[in-house]
Amino acid sequence: MSVLAPDAVEGLFDQIAPIYDNLNDQLSFGLHRLWKRMAVKWSAAKPGDRVLDLCCGSGDLAFLLAKVVGSKGQVIGFDRSQALLSVAGDRARQLASALVIDWQRGDALDLPFPDDHFDAATLGYGLRNVPDIPTVLRQLQRVLKPGARAAILDMHRPYSPLLRQFQQVYLDRWVVPAAAAQNCAAEYEYIDASLEAFPQGQQQVALAIAAGFQRAKHYELAAGLMGVLVVEA
């Protein structure tokens, strides 16, 4: 569960939208792009599919999905932050490609899509920021077709005490100072508290099964600093 109210989370991401992509590259040394490609692969999206990128942010996963589903498929990028959706739309226009993505603003707690609608879905760095994780998982399960997969990528607190210490030093001495240089220190200080409140891998699996998914498996990435929850409706 997010440690901030929904409007506060929306305001936070609206604030960091202009620097979001550059700072993500800097803070992850570009590795977030590799992890996102892995998430798209785990989603099992294929040409011609109708797919959802929930909490799409500036659109990285949506662009990757659009390349997979091709001109006969459909991608919806869905987010609460209008500022990030504007960044995503600007990026799409700059690419000037044949990729067609429908950007929609709304609430992940109440998705405006019919049941059994999507062939696959992704959710990158968003589940940690929602106010009610079980409700979002139930909504995601509802809109996926039976047998469809979703891949949910996010940061995690690792189980290892040594790695937890490393993560804390990384956040305190690298992430927040780098954000401070962009006048966004307060926004990135929020990451620490959000990680403390975020369920770890096996807890996420249990939540997914309780939400109605038939199968769920959590994969650790980067020694447990990141992870992907793969679920099947």
UniProtKB/Swiss-Prot annotation:
Belongs to the class I-like SAM-binding methyltransferase superfamily. MenG/UbiE family. HAMAP family: MenG_phylloquinone_subfam (MF_01982), MenG_UbiE_methyltr (MF_01813). Keywords: Methyltransferase, S-adenosyl-L-methionine, Transferase. It is an enzyme of class 2 (transferase). InterPro entries: MenG, SAM-dependent_MTases_sf, UbiE/COQ5_MeTrFase, UbiE/COQ5_MeTrFase_CS. GO terms for biological process: methylation; phylloquinone biosynthetic process. GO terms for molecular function: 2-phytyl-1,4-naphthoquinone methyltransferase activity. The lineage of its organism: Bacteria, Bacillati, Cyanobacteriota, Cyanophyceae, Synechococcales. Pathway: Cofactor biosynthesis; phylloquinone biosynthesis. PROSITE patterns: SAM_MT_UBIE (PS51608), UBIE_1 (PS01183). It comes from Synechococcus elongatus (strain ATCC 33912 / PCC 7942 / FACHB-805). Methyltransferase required for the conversion of 2-phytyl-1,4-beta-naphthoquinol to phylloquinol. The keyword Aminoacyl-tRNA synthetase does not apply. NCBIfam families: MenG_MenH_UbiE, PRK00216.1-5. CDD domains: AdoMet_MTases. Signal peptide: none annotated. This is 2-phytyl-1,4-naphtoquinone methyltransferase. The gene is menG. Its EC number is 2.1.1.329. It catalyses: demethylphylloquinol + S-adenosyl-L-methionine = phylloquinol + S-adenosyl-L-homocysteine + H(+).
